[in-house]
Amino acid sequence: PRAVTEFNYRISDADQAHVFVGLAITKREEADKIERGFVRHGFATVNLTDDELAKEHVRHMVGGRSPLAADERLFRFVFPERPGALMRFLDAMHPGWNISLFHYRNQGADYGRILVGLQVPAKDDKAFTTFLKTLGYPYVEETNNPVYKLFLKS
């Protein structure tokens, strides 16, 4: 298993997802091996290990407004930095809900700050409230935050 150091996603295409993922490596050759593994499992991959533009700037710009993010609600979560924390979140989600935005960057702390955009049908509001309460991770809804409205909200 490899430590995920960064994970950025914004819905932009109904047919395919473009995800910016950072993985911990100790040797440059490991990046090529990881890339081959992704390709072997059917994932199109662009290796950005040596791409300074990606590492210094574009990693912070993944996303923007998306016409596919209608009825999106935005949340900040605090996840424990331990194996299984994200899987617990994903397993608890209803299959009819959609993650339209996801941003995580490992800061070296014992917890991770996650930003998630979720598309949840209005008919599921009660189930969604239960999901948030039983998940047990601290969260803040940011759907009405001015910076969200300026740069991300469709």
PLM features: what roles do these ranges have?
Residues P1-S154:
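A conserved regulatory-domain signal marking ACT and ACT-like small-molecule sensing domains
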